[in-house]
Amino acid sequence: MHKHRKPTEADVTPESLFYQRRRVLKALGISAAALSLPLSAQADLLAWFKGSDKPKAPPGKPLTFSQPTDWKLDLPLTPEDKVTGYNNFYEFGLDKADPAANAGGLKTDGWTIKIDGDVAKPLTLDIDDLLKRFPLEERIYRFRCVEAWSMVIPWVGFELAKLIKFAEPTSNARYVAFQTLHDPEQMPGQKDRFMGGGLDYPYVEGLRMDEAMNPLALLAVGVYGKTLPPQNGAPIRLVTPWKYGFKNIKSIVHIRLTRERPPCTWNLAAPDEYGFYANVNPHVDHPRWSQATERVIGSGGLLNVERQPTLLFNGYAEQVASLYRGLNLRDNF
């Protein structure tokens, strides 16, 4: 049984990356006092040496969408600047502010997404095709990171199930595999193992078919009523609100239906820490910190922190618990 304690930045950052960063800063002559700063402040010091002339992302374009009452939460939304400024997207850096700082030049014009594998109708659609073919709706979802922090986010998108049905899956299709864009020139973390966390790219994820067909599973193309900014996974990303955030793969270019369980990036990198299912569960701790509570990202700063109990399946048990009936959630984390 793991002791419940408040995670430190060394905890929520993989240990090898945490200490590698400190070695680099020491090699640059950074003082011991500077090394005691939070990782975000240390990143600012590194940025001083690297330069910070990064292109800014264009403003998001307004989207047309419905607002079904079924998907509204009686909870305050996380401020937009926190949703777009506090992100994990290692293709653009390890710190929470790195994606917003480094992803502005991501080119999404003419973006296509390929759907193939065990389907009767393989497809390649561009983002405009998707927006025309599948009506958009706003869904306000809880978002829970495996690092024990949470947000409430108004996504705009359409059900993943609609795209899968359009491709006509065969009876062999038991899983859905996803892949992020692989473009090291645009995504510097893919060519710099320090900047990209030492992960193997492209980033890949997967769901069971019944999970993918659940009405909660969303392909999001927008947030706060506008097209997604690059740091949030433009132009299209997965949102599965009952799972930890690392399952919510960003900047998708390929969806493949398959009979075999697909590989998943974090599960490959650290299988004892990041499971295939990644369902939010307050009773199953991460090996290095508790999942019983979560830090709510709100309008205040780091010193104005609210914690709340974590809900099983992130509060979506009524919609998804039946998917895992008879499954040991501790072993299949």
Curated annotation (Swiss-Prot):
Post-translational modification: Predicted to be exported by the Tat system. The position of the signal peptide cleavage has not been experimentally proven.
Keyword tags: Metal-binding, Molybdenum, Oxidoreductase, Periplasm, Signal
SUPFAM superfamilies: Oxidoreductase molybdopterin-binding domain
Alphabetized GO MF terms: metal ion binding; molybdopterin cofactor binding; oxidoreductase activity, acting on a sulfur group of donors, quinone or similar compound as acceptor
Note accompanying the cofactor annotation: Binds 1 Mo-molybdopterin (Mo-MPT) cofactor per subunit.
Highest taxon above the source species: Bacteria
Cofactor: Mo-molybdopterin
Entry coiled-coil feature ranges: none
Swiss-Prot/TrEMBL GO biological process terms: protein repair
Reactions catalysed: L-methionyl-[protein] + a quinone + H2O = L-methionyl-(S)-S-oxide-[protein] + a quinol; L-methionyl-[protein] + a quinone + H2O = L-methionyl-(R)-S-oxide-[protein] + a quinol
EC number(s) from the headed UniProt entry: 1.8.5.-
Record-listed Mo-molybdopterin binding positions: N87, Y90, E91, C145, T180, N232, R237, N248, I249, K250
Subcellular location: Periplasm
Family matches, as PANTHER family: PROTEIN-METHIONINE-SULFOXIDE REDUCTASE, PROTEIN-METHIONINE-SULFOXIDE REDUCTASE CATALYTIC SUBUNIT MSRP
Family indicated by similarity: Belongs to the MsrP family.
Subunit structure: Heterodimer of a catalytic subunit (MsrP) and a heme-binding subunit (MsrQ).
The protein's name in its UniProt record: Protein-methionine-sulfoxide reductase catalytic subunit MsrP
